[in-house]
Amino acid sequence: MAPPAAVSPPSRSAELATSTKLPVMSKNINTKTVEEMLGQWDDFKFAPIRESQVSRAMTRRYFQDLDNYAESDIVIIGAGSCGLSAAYILGKKRPDLKIAIIEASVSPGGGAWLGGQLFSAMIMRKPADAFLREVGVPYEDEGNYVVVKHAALFTSTIMSKVLQMPNIKLFNATCVEDLITRPSEEGVRIAGVVTNWTLVSMHHDDQSCMDPNTINAPLIISTTGHDGPMGAFCVKRLVSMQRIEKLGGMRGLDMNLAEDAIVKGTREIVPGLIVGGMELSEVDGANRMGPTFGAMALSGLKAAEEALKIFDTRKKQNDL
């Protein structure tokens, strides 16, 4: 006699979703404007809610995003000024592409929330002022350079534009632990990223059973910054993978040499991996640029341009 077939119990999802009576929406809750609320605080009241509604609203959307972006078109590692600039151009030029941004910090923006030595103003040398006009950030013209009154104005502006694009998803508090690879004629091709919660990655030495997750993508743009706890991650991994012999090491500060070198050098380092921003200085041995941000923005633009040139080729390879 054959063993009994396994039978799944009836689904209770619908029952659980409807078993608890939810608060009734007030009829006039949607009629309020800011002007109507001002001066009426004695009668003020939020719309009713149940705590489970909040949990489900967050959880459902996040897991839907994880599912949607498990197969992405382009992954950008690092949401600093370079990564966000690249995302802006890609999202604008190719709204058909699914673009995932992975940021290790809770707060995107990298070092672009302040200028040098924790001062407020952001300096960009011309012609990077063209990008400020593109995204609508006001500035003071000082001849060869421009000044944004607070660096946070640039970062918050470009971030808000990028996050409103329907084809872009930011996964912050998430870090890239490794790269997905495939054999190719060039030796190896990068075909995605291995991700984990940042706090989990920071505790691999004292915890166990914390395997990562993955995102497949035919093209990765790495803009993780110069060497540091999370910086220059991809190029350091390429060394350990023996895809590049060694890091060039960032040189001393020279704004005039550094910014030109970073923008011009932004490129695909190995098949499927474009490197931009200060991470590139660790490969090429470029100079440090200090508190001037024009090259970060324009390196992002060039990274996006390079990505669009090679995307179709890498996607065909990825589909094989």
UniProtKB/Swiss-Prot annotation:
Its cofactor is Fe cation. Keywords: Cytoplasm, Iron, Metal-binding, NAD, Nucleus, Stress response, Thiamine biosynthesis, Transferase. GO terms for cellular component: cytosol; nucleus. It comes from the Eukaryota. The keyword Cytoplasm applies. GO terms for molecular function: cysteine-dependent adenosine diphosphate thiazole synthase activity; iron ion binding. It catalyses: [ADP-thiazole synthase]-L-cysteine + glycine + NAD(+) = [ADP-thiazole synthase]-dehydroalanine + ADP-5-ethyl-4-methylthiazole-2-carboxylate + nicotinamide + 3 H2O + 2 H(+). One of its GO terms (biological process) is thiazole biosynthetic process. Induction: Repressed by thiamine. Induced by ethanol, Cu(2+) chloride and heat. During the catalytic reaction, a sulfide is transferred from Cys-209 to a reaction intermediate, generating a dehydroalanine residue. Homooctamer. Involved in biosynthesis of the thiamine precursor thiazole. Catalyzes the conversion of NAD and glycine to adenosine diphosphate 5-(2-hydroxyethyl)-4-methylthiazole-2-carboxylic acid (ADT), an adenylated thiazole intermediate. The reaction includes an iron-dependent sulfide transfer from a conserved cysteine residue of the protein to a thiazole intermediate. The enzyme can only undergo a single turnover, which suggests it is a suicide enzyme. May have additional roles in adaptation to various stress conditions and in DNA damage tolerance. Belongs to the THI4 family. This is Thiamine thiazole synthase. It comes from Fusarium oxysporum. The gene is sti35.
